[in-house]
Design a protein with these regions (language model features):
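Bacterial N-terminal signal peptides
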Residues: 9-19
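Flexible glycine/proline-enriched surface loops and loop-helix/loop-strand junctions
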Residues: 79-82, 136-140, 150-156, 229-238, ...
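Carbohydrate-binding/catalytic loop surfaces
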Residues: 190-232, 236-238, 284, 289-291
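Active-site helix/loop module of the DD-peptidase/beta-lactamase fold
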Residues: 35, 51, 81, 86-90, ...
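Catalytic loop of the DD-peptidase/beta-lactamase superfamily, centered on the K-T-G motif
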Residues: 27-66, 164, 171-172, 176, ...
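Bacterial N-terminal signal peptides that target proteins for export
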Residues: 1-10
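Boundary at the C-terminal end of the N-terminal hydrophobic targeting segment
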Residues: 21-26
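Well-ordered alpha-helical segments within folded domains of soluble proteins
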Residues: 95-96, 150-155, 247-250
């Protein structure tokens, strides 16, 4: 009996046979979305994700959004585009934007030593840029090694250059500006301590509390399916912890593409591969993975907790975006994307094959 990875590969092979046999003339958004739905539902079951919410944007507007499975299995609460999830490491893309806002204002240089802001990185020569590009380990700048714990050191950098705590900067400089009214900068705001509550006004705290009620329950994948699980850490850092929905992340995507947060030149800098000290192009830029697939530029990030997972994939030159959120680790945990290849994900592979012919 093949394992889960083998079953996913077999399913993809069979479904790609169907796709390859489809006449090119039948390719359009409605037909493509219908075919993609079949992939998502089949992969959701094999990867043991109880619920998935998904959106596709083309030319700055959502052209398809759907929920699959359940946000709460026992209560049979369906996953919808408005369902909230912990988006895990997709939070890193927000951190990138917050730091580049500081660079634009002149309150930060990416080439400052990270030690000025945090003692968490032991390499004395490591800079903010090194941490942001996952090149701070060993000889800074020499090699890429994805490390979410190190990335969390950027929390204190945002605190300093924005002049306010990370979660408050995230709320005021990104969430509010993009009208992401259902997103919550930290699960701990459901029942905030007095010091956390002091960061936001009463209506905002009430909105956060209401939004958390739509948070999908967490599950962990197991050999025979998925099982209820505890929540991941409830606080937030530069590395992870934002709660959001695909509806709100679609607003974020549109705001990125219309330069609401930072100048286009700054965004393109974030989407440029870092270069090692030996001249090697690395798979990561400033808070984003970057690669080319069949000549098409892809910028992306994945999110991974044992209980939640996520995928955010953009083809900016094609004005095309996919966002997937799930309430187990199944969107990411079986697929080695940390090395820099989004095509290790069958979800991404299906999307690229269908929508980027």
């Amino acid at each position: 009996m093949p394992g889960r990875g083998g079953l996913i590969a077999l399913t993809l092979t069979l479904m790609f046979v169907i796709l390859w046999a489809r006449p090119a003339s039948t390719q359009n958004d409605d037909a493509d979305a219908a075919l993609f739905e079949r992939y998502i539902e089949a992969l959701r079951r094999i990867a043991h994700v109880p619920g998935i919410s998904a959106v596709i944007l083309r030319d700055g507007r959502p052209v398809w959004q759907r929920g699959f499975g359940f946000a709460n299995v026992d209560a049979r609460v369906p996953a919808t585009p408005d369902t909230l999830y912990d988006i895990a490491s997709l939070t890193k893309t927000f951190t990138s934007t917050l730091l580049l806002q500081c660079v634009e204002r002149g309150t930060l240089s990416l080439d400052e030593r990270i030690a000025r802001y945090s003692a968490a990185i032991p390499e004395p020569a490591a800079t903010v840029r090194h941490v942001l590009t996952h090149t701070s380990q060993g000889t800074p700048g020499a090699a890429f090694r994805y490390d979410g714990d190190r990335f969390a050191a950027l929390t204190s950098v945002v605190d300093s250059c924005h002049g306010r705590p990370f979660r408050q900067a995230l709320a005021t400089s990104i969430l509010d500006r993009a009208a992401m009214t259902n997103s919550v900068p930290g699960h701990d705001l459901e029942r905030p301590t007095p010091s956390l509550a002091a960061l936001f006004d009463v209506p905002t705290l009430g909105r956060y509390e209401g939004s958390v009620k739509r948070l999908a329950l967490p599950y962990q994948t197991a050999a025979d399916g998925s099982a209820p699980a505890g929540y991941p850490p409830r606080d937030i850092s530069a590395s992870a912890g934002l709660l959001s929905s695909v509806v709100d992340l679609a607003k974020y995507d549109v705001a990125i593409d219309t330069n609401v947060f930072i100048f286009r030149a700054s965004q393109e800098l974030a989407w440029t591969n870092a270069v090692s000290t030996t001249g090697e192009a690395l798979p990561y830029g400033l808070g984003w993975f970057i690669q080319r697939e069949r000549g098409v530029r892809l910028v992306w990030h994945y999110g991974q907790w044992p209980q939640y997972s996520a995928l955010y994939l953009k083809a900016p030159d094609r004005h095309l975006t996919l966002i997937l959120l799930g309430n187990s680790g199944g969107l990411s945990e079986a697929f080695p994307m940390a090395g820099g290849d989004v095509m290790a994900s069958p979800f991404a592979k299906a999307f690229v094959r269908i929508f980027i012919p």
